[in-house]
Amino acid sequence: GLVGSEMCIRDSCEAQWQKYDAETLNLNGMVVDGFNHQGYGLNRYCYSGKGTWSTCEYLPMGIAEDRETGETYIFQIESSGQWLAEYGSAQGGNLYLALSGATEQEHGWYKNLKPGESFTTVPAGAAVVKGGPNPAAAALTRYRRKVRRPNTDDEKLNVVFNDYMNCLMGDPTTERELSIIDKAAELGCEYYCLDAGWYDDGFWWDRVGEWKEASGRFPNGLKEVCDYVHSKGLKMGLWLEIEVMGVACELANKLPDDWFVCRHGKRHIDNKRYMLDFRNPEVRKYCRDVVDRLINDYGVEYFKVDYNVTMGYGSDLNSDSCADAIREHYECLHQWYEEIFRDHPELVVENCGSGGQRMDYGMLKILSLQSTSDQTDYLYNANIAANVASAVTPEQGGMWVYPYEDEEEHVIYNVVNGMLLRPYISGMVWKLGENSMNRMKEGISLYKEIREEVRDGVPFFPLGFGTLKSEVLAYGVKAEKNTYLSVWTPGTTEAVIPLENAEQVRRVSVIYPKEEMCGYKIENGNLVVKMPQEKAARLFKIEMK
């Protein structure tokens, strides 16, 4: 029998796996080949990405376990736009899996090839392993590292402070920024990213597009803030949503329609935004000039590039089909990024799409860091942290660490969320007392000690993938010498975690917090943990003989 799984994206609770038996999906392996009839089924089970948020419903990946052979198949479709994963019945009692980009049936995709022209579909990666989801996830992680653009950010795993989530929430001023920059430097962060709002004095949602500083927010200029970041030894970052212009943006209303995604003779509008069409070389040049200007004027070395609205099902302007316009847009966007990195090889670009709504390896082959969610609750964030290394490599998985209460276990839980991924620091740092700040500093310092092992290790999920109902969550990284394990107890005080090769374990210890503050032992091949309360988390180090 075969069990199929796919990754479901819920808004602000990304990376939640769903598991189905093949028979439940009406794809059973029974050979219906009676007298004079060669049996195969016509049923299929599909899931897909429908627009330009490639992962707003499902991630373009999946796992299939063959219980009869003990093999597991894992795959990903490397598309930033539309895609399709299809399971179906084949002859001889077999099942098939077909992976593709946009299709005519599901997406209305059509492309007319003229004589001498050729077409290549989006790439996909797949692996088959003996064993279950853990060796499969390890294999896909190694593959992702091989196909990714070599870059120093994913070698070093820089620690970034971002001023948005549970912090300034898009309302920056010079006064607010300077005090938070002090906190970021004190914590030991290496980059400081000024998020949304820096380009407009008021309600900015429908006015974005020119990316010029707001004088009301920064009376002495934005450069004063950037220079202060640099004076503290941090590198400067800015938020951009480069693929859009607001309907109230003065520049947008002076530009021709072919700069934008259009349908039925009009510009497509999504939530008071126009979508720039990167197939137009003038658009690409304008956006490149924006990036170069911000780098040259402010010393920016990091961009968080967001994508909060979509072009729906595409553009009918200068395209064989709306869906093909999406595909061509993304080909041009990927090339645009590659050209930027050729000229600015040390630049870091974070991939964001209202959190994880564009978390695909079309983008992540090129960009070094992924915003995994817009989730604002630290408890639900752990549900993402426990699973998301199945969707991205651990070092690319930007995980919010954003305490908003001055309480020790709250801070520890937040820090553990990020320790085996890429901790992405934010929160109400002005509320944190000395003890809470010290806990944050302790965690960031420890992360710098183990991040090379996070970079080289492979993920595993000793309890399987967590759900929103899980009382215990566990996620680990297995490195060459050591194994690290994050354990959360959102709904209980005791966790029982099976250990692989438990008889070979030489030592187990809690390494965050350093005082341990919990009980634990190895018993019957399990790590048994007694937490001091519900809603607690600890980071363990497991050393083998």
Language-model features, listed with the residues they occupy:
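Alpha-helix-loop-beta-strand connector modules within alpha/beta enzyme cores
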Residues: P219-L234, R327-H344
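Short acidic catalytic loops
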Residues: G1, C189-Y199, L238, Y286-N318, ...
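Conserved, mostly hydrophobic/aromatic
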Residues: G116, V229, C287, D306, ...
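Beta-strand-rich recognition/accessory modules
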Residues: H37-P150
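Aromatic-lined carbohydrate-binding/catalytic grooves of carbohydrate-active enzymes
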Residues: D154-D289, Y302
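Short, small-residue-biased leader/transition segments that mark boundaries at the very start
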Residues: L2-I9
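Active-site-proximal substrate-binding groove within the catalytic cores of carbohydrate-active enzymes
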Residues: L333-Y520, N526-K541
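Histidine/acidic-residue-rich catalytic or RNA/ligand-binding cores of hydrolases
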Residues: F203-W205, A248-N253, Y313-L317, R358-S368, ...
